[in-house]
């Protein structure tokens, strides 16, 4: 099986623990005042409405930075999303490119643990994408800790990277499964290891 093919499936219990992913009003996030080396994509957050729409929701967050107002249902059809989730980061890239004129590409992190070179590549890709007001959509599996020590764990999930600080040592994640805490900061190496075995669209 292609290593970047992973389903987005949250258990009902997992969704409840995540605060219930109910799509409420979209929240616009304009770029705040930035420090040196800080960049934010001008995105609009929207939670996923069910346990299997993390792919469409993350793609929608990314497309909002382009000023695209696309429904999650429309994206789900294009992505082939079912109750088993969205198959692949390749599908995310394909659909993002339909709306952006080909700005996205898929990158794999094939190893179980990201190598220093793969971390450096992710860091460079996040910088280039966010500088271009293009959020990164990551396909993750398992658990990772944010900078506050809070663990986030999924049996397969998509989320969006919308901001970085400094030399891209820490990144801000917009997580469509967490409307109660829609964003959190994570070390870029931790994120790379969360993606490991899968891929991302940047």
Where are these regions (language model features)?
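Active-site-adjacent structural segments surrounding the nucleophilic cysteine of cysteine proteases
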Residues: 1-95, 142, 149-150, 165-168
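Conserved active-site-adjacent core of cysteine acyl-enzyme catalytic domains
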Residues: 74-202
């Amino acid at each position: 099986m292609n290593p970047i093919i992973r389903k987005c499936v949250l258990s009902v219990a997992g969704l409840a623990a995540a605060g219930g992913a109910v799509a409420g009003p979209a929240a616009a996030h304009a770029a705040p005042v930035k420090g040196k080396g800080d960049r934010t994509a001008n995105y609009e957050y929207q939670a996923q409405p069910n346990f299997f729409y993390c792919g469409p929701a993350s793609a929608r967050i990314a497309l909002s930075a382009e000023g695209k107002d696309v429904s999650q249902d429309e994206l789900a059809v294009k992505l082939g999303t079912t109750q088993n989730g969205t198959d692949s980061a390749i599908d995310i890239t394909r659909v993002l490119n339909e709306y952006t004129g080909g700005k996205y590409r898929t990158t794999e992190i094939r190893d179980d643990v990201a190598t220093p070179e793969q971390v450096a590549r992710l860091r460079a890709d996040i910088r280039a994408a966010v500088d271009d007001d293009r959020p990164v959509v990551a396909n993750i599996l398992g658990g990772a800790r944010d900078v506050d020590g809070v663990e986030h764990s999924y049996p397969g999930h998509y989320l969006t990277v919308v901001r970085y600080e400094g030399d891209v040592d820490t990144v801000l994640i917009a997580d469509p499964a967490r409307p109660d805490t829609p964003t959190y900061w994570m070390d870029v190496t931790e994120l790379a290891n969360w993606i490991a075995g899968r891929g991302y669209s940047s």
